[in-house]
């Protein structure tokens, strides 16, 4: 059974709020950057970047991070993993980086992203923005900006659909029946 958590309009309002939360903590200058974790994290970062520009009139640095080779579960993901480009067209040293992803679960994706990011320099600070924090952490990782805290059972699946990738915007929870 699939349960709708947020529709497209609600997801857009969530991203508006997150953009305002980022602006409450940061000046928009060349020391702040949004870096999206592939795949859906890049679209979230782009949307936050656009919303911040609409509010402030200022551009935010933007990058895309592929963590495939940094995953500790690489052999479980695919026999032949598909690598996508990492595109961080600026020096991250001394910058505040806001990593963006769709769902925060065990923390392992973020651990991999931190390892990958360290190959590009030494930021002064790294923060985390996620659309959904579903709990069940296996590592001591906490998001700085959260669209929705959604306590789940480990057997449930959170689906975030973004129109750039999935053709529509929504957050749904797949609840498995105990039949």
From Swiss-Prot:
It comes from the Bacteria. A motif (PRPP-binding) lies at residues 97-109. Keywords: Glycosyltransferase, Transcription, Transcription regulation, Transferase. It catalyses: UMP + diphosphate = 5-phospho-alpha-D-ribose 1-diphosphate + uracil. It is an enzyme of class 2 (transferase). GO terms for molecular function: uracil phosphoribosyltransferase activity. Its EC number is 2.4.2.9. One of its GO terms (biological process) is regulation of DNA-templated transcription. Belongs to the purine/pyrimidine phosphoribosyltransferase family. PyrR subfamily. Regulates the transcription of the pyrimidine nucleotide (pyr) operon in response to exogenous pyrimidines. NCBIfam families: PRK05205.1-1, PRK05205.1-5. This is Bifunctional protein PyrR. It comes from Elusimicrobium minutum (strain Pei191).
């Amino acid at each position: 059974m699939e349960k709708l958590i947020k529709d497209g309009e609600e997801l857009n309002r969530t991203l508006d709020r997150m953009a305002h939360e980022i602006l409450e903590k940061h000046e928009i200058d060349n020391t702040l950057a949004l870096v999206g974790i592939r795949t859906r994290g890049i679209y979230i970062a782009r949307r936050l970047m656009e919303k911040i520009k609409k509010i402030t009139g200022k551009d935010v640095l933007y990058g895309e991070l592929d963590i495939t080779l940094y995953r500790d579960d690489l052999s479980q993901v695919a026999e032949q993993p598909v690598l996508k480009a990492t595109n961080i067209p600026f020096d991250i040293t001394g910058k505040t980086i806001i990593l963006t992803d769709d769902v925060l679960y065990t923390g392992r994706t973020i651990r991999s992203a931190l390892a990958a990011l360290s190959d590009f320099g030494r930021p002064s600070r790294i923060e985390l923005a996620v659309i959904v924090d579903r709990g069940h952490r296996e590592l001591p990782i906490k998001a700085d900006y959260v669209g929705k805290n959604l306590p789940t059972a480990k057997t449930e699946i959170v689906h975030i659909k973004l129109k750039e990738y999935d053709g529509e915007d929504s957050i749904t929870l797949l609840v498995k029946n105990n039949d």
